């Protein structure tokens, strides 16, 4: 490593990138929550909260970009307050943490990984809902889906997952 950066923390950048991932097995119910939207499905997910893999991965991406741990540290599954909780509460909390540190979401790129349900009819509602939670324009939020081509637990219809990448930028543009 160059002596130039040895022992220094890189805090002077005006952008940061975070990546999040979440996965849940299917369980009894008639819907799944995805991107804050109730999507009818033959089953739900096994989770402590509402099990929204997109919003959980979004929280992890935001927290990771700030170096603030993960969703489990902020909302432990052992805490009964979060039993069945709306994952939008988690996203609003993470957004508050960003704002308190003078950061803002620049854009979100979310991918649901599932064989079913098909999410195309719900994508615009997801984008708009996530944008409201983050206080950004819907154009700053991308939501899409892919399958696992029949491979693994997702391919067997046993669950679903999501990956989210988030770009943060400084609200005031000041380098610290």
UniProtKB/Swiss-Prot annotation:
UniProt xrefs under SUPFAM superfamilies: IpsF-like
Listed EC numbers: 4.6.1.12
Pathway membership: Isoprenoid biosynthesis; isopentenyl diphosphate biosynthesis via DXP pathway; isopentenyl diphosphate from 1-deoxy-D-xylulose 5-phosphate: step 4/6
Cofactor binding summary note: Binds 1 divalent metal cation per subunit.
Annotated a divalent metal cation binding sites: 22, 24, 56
Reported cofactor(s): a divalent metal cation
Signal peptide: none
Gene3D superfamilies: 2-C-methyl-D-erythritol 2,4-cyclodiphosphate synthase (3.30.1330.50)
Site features described as Transition state stabilizer, chain residue numbers: 48, 147
Keywords, sorted A to Z: Isoprene biosynthesis, Lyase, Metal-binding
Keyword field contains Phosphoprotein: no
Pfam families the record matches: YgbB
Catalytic activity: 4-CDP-2-C-methyl-D-erythritol 2-phosphate = 2-C-methyl-D-erythritol 2,4-cyclic diphosphate + CMP
GO MF entry, a single one: 2-C-methyl-D-erythritol 2,4-cyclodiphosphate synthase activity
Summary of the function given for this chain in its UniProt record: Involved in the biosynthesis of isopentenyl diphosphate (IPP) and dimethylallyl diphosphate (DMAPP), two major building blocks of isoprenoid compounds. Catalyzes the conversion of 4-diphosphocytidyl-2-C-methyl-D-erythritol 2-phosphate (CDP-ME2P) to 2-C-methyl-D-erythritol 2,4-cyclodiphosphate (ME-CPP) with a corresponding release of cytidine 5-monophosphate (CMP).
Family classification: Belongs to the IspF family.
Protein name stated in the entry: 2-C-methyl-D-erythritol 2,4-cyclodiphosphate synthase
Species of origin: Xylella fastidiosa (strain Temecula1 / ATCC 700964)
Gene: ispF
């Amino acid at each position: 490593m160059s002596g130039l950066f040895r022992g220094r923390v890189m805090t002077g950048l005006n952008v940061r990138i975070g990546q999040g991932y979440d996965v849940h097995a299917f369980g009894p119910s008639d819907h799944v929550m995805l991107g804050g939207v109730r999507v009818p499905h033959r089953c739900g997910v096994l989770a402590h909260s509402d099990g929204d893999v997109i919003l959980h991965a979004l929280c992890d991406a935001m927290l990771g970009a700030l170096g603030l741990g993960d969703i489990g540290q902020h909302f432990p599954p052992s805490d009964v307050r979060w039993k069945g909780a709306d994952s939008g509460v988690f996203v609003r909390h993470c957004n508050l943490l960003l704002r308190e540190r003078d950061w803002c979401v620049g854009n979100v790129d979310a991918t649901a990984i599932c064989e079913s349900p098909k999410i195309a009819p719900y994508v615009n509602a997801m984008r708009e809902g996530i944008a409201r939670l983050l206080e950004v324009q819907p154009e700053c939020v991308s939501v899409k889906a892919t399958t696992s081509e029949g491979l693994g637990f997702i391919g067997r219809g046993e669950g679903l997952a999501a990956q989210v990448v988030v770009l943060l930028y400084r609200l005031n543009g000041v380098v610290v």
